[in-house]
Amino acid sequence: FGYFCMSLIMTSSPLHMHLIKKFSLFETSIAIQLHVVGMFLPSLISGDLVKRFGSTKIIYVGVTIGFFSIFVNTMFDHYYTYVIGLISLGIMWNLLFISGSSLLVISYEEKDKFTAQGLNDFIVFSTQGIGALSAGFLLYYSNWTIINLICIPFLLMVIFVSFLSSNNKSI
């Protein structure tokens, strides 16, 4: 669900910033470029953080950063807050993707690894596609705040499933 939220907000943000808030294409592109840095730069340490603190704790940190991104995106209306919101969205995605991937490899038996990976990839990229393809439609028929708020129940589900899996090692 982290991929869905990231894709939904990331895809709608340049439309919102340029067409609705009238930021220049240059400003909008810089914001997206910094978001991409936020997505991938943490990879230098996120694997080590998962090893040191465990996947579940890093998932909780990622979700917290996601809530921070939603807060910044919905409560403030300045160029730099869009940049901060997008960078934190990228960091959220990174932490959820890395920690979720590390949980996946320990969650199935060896004989099921290809099926588990295939099913995971199908779910992850389907939700990502839904987020990306629905962004323009949702922005047109609602607004920036609603797009961000849509992600809250998905992040709450991530917390719930992570809590269940940390209390039941067979999940």
Question: Model segments located where?
Answer:
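Conserved extracellular-gate-facing transmembrane-helix segments in secondary transporters
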Residues: 1-10
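Short amphipathic helix-loop junctions that connect adjacent transmembrane helices
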Residues: 11-31
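Helix-to-loop junctions at the C-terminal end of transmembrane segments
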Residues: 41-55, 139
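Structural signature of the two symmetry-related core transmembrane helices
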Residues: 57-71, 152
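Paired small-residue
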Residues: 69, 80-88
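Intracellular juxtamembrane helix-capping segments at the cytosolic ends
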Residues: 95-108
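A late C-terminal transmembrane helix in Major Facilitator Superfamily
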Residues: 112-141
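A membrane-interface helix-boundary motif in multi-pass transporters
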Residues: 137-155
